[in-house]
Amino acid sequence: MAKEQQVQANDLQEKLIAVNRVSKTVKGGRIMSFTALTVVGDGNGRVGFGYGKAREVPAAIQKAMEKARRSMVTIALNEGTLHHPVKGRHSGSKVYMQPAAEGTGVIAGGAMRAVLEVAGVHNVLSKAYGSTNPINIVRATIDALVDVKSPEMVAAKRGLTVEAISE
């Protein structure tokens, strides 16, 4: 039931990662509803994800997109790749990402690829360990991307210059 879709809306890239049918059992039978997992990004270091649930698929997607737009975070990129190798985890999912040379492309699978593409990461090597549940992979990927620190951020935190750190 998982599918991907990309739509341009006010310069944000939107991707639908997964649609799932779920049911609630009540006295009279089952009540079916749908969940949608989406990510949005500006392709330049801002990314967010949303998880929506409704009785109809379009409504679930709409809710997920709204939540994704409201939960956007900014990440530090280095000319389309990461500054340094980084790990992230959420629940049973663990992800590892490392910078890659120009022309490598996004080496990632499924949900992680969607997050990296909308975030504006063009060259990266990545691997998912443990659970490959799309929601947990998305959360772990964003957790890892938030941990990326640019040399300027590290220098400011240490009270040094960028040149002093790179030695």
From Swiss-Prot:
Keyword Ribosomal protein: yes
UniProt GO BP: translation
Record family assignment: Belongs to the universal ribosomal protein uS5 family.
GO CC, alphabetical: cytosolic small ribosomal subunit
Domain notes for this protein: The N-terminal domain interacts with the head of the 30S subunit; the C-terminal domain interacts with the body and contacts protein S4. The interaction surface between S4 and S5 is involved in control of translational fidelity.
Assembly behavior: Part of the 30S ribosomal subunit. Contacts proteins S4 and S8.
InterPro entries membership: Ribosomal_Su5_D2-typ_SF, Ribosomal_uS5, Ribosomal_uS5_bac-type, Ribosomal_uS5_C, Ribosomal_uS5_N, Ribosomal_uS5_N_CS, Ribsml_uS5_D2-typ_fold_subgr
Gene designation: rpsE
Purpose: With S4 and S12 plays an important role in translational accuracy. Located at the back of the 30S subunit body where it stabilizes the conformation of the head with respect to the body.
Name of the featured protein: Small ribosomal subunit protein uS5
GO molecular function: rRNA binding; structural constituent of ribosome
UniProt-listed Pfam families: Ribosomal_S5, Ribosomal_S5_C
Annotated ranges, domain S5 DRBM: 12-75
Keywords assigned by UniProt, alphabetized: Ribonucleoprotein, Ribosomal protein, RNA-binding, rRNA-binding
